Amino acid sequence: MLDIKLKYKDIEIVNIEKENIEDIFYMMKSNENEVNVDYHPLTKVEELEDTFIEYYLSECEFFIKIMYRSYLVGLIKGRAEFKNPNEIWILYFLKNRYKLEDREWYNIIHNLEIYFFKQYGIDDFYVVVNNNNLNLINIFKKNGFSISRIYEKNKYDNINNNEIVLKKLRHVNRIKYYI
């Protein structure tokens, strides 16, 4: 597990702990959230506990909660790949659509990028987003992400559910981003 502790203004971004599992599960099942991918297979709290243990034992994965004034407003799960250049892959991004405005989410993403660079030397960032989730796509695009590729998924109920990989390659313009 990558250890993450970031606090600024009224935002705190920290690792999920075992005692958070039940609250996290019910947040994931709530319809007040916006998620980067439409499909989440968990149906029981015990399945999330298994996911938690897997992340906890892995040295390159992270599963973090985003708190705003002590309210749980978001979750991010992903992994780091340490190669040249180092990368972060955000595989699950959930945000409460009512607690924070989009501009605050821009700041959260930006501050996480800086944190990952300073703590772990991460230069490049990738996120997978469902092509129908235009709001999340725009949040990441306004943060300097661009479309890298599109994965065509099987149609479900005649709806195209392709996944888009957005990327931000900071190693190309490192001086621009960190000064």
Where are these regions (language model features)?
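Alpha-helical elements of Rossmann-like donor-binding domains used by nucleotide-donor carbohydrate transfer enzymes
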Residues: 23-26, 47-51, 107, 111-115
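Conserved GNAT acetyl-CoA-binding A-motif
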Residues: 117-128
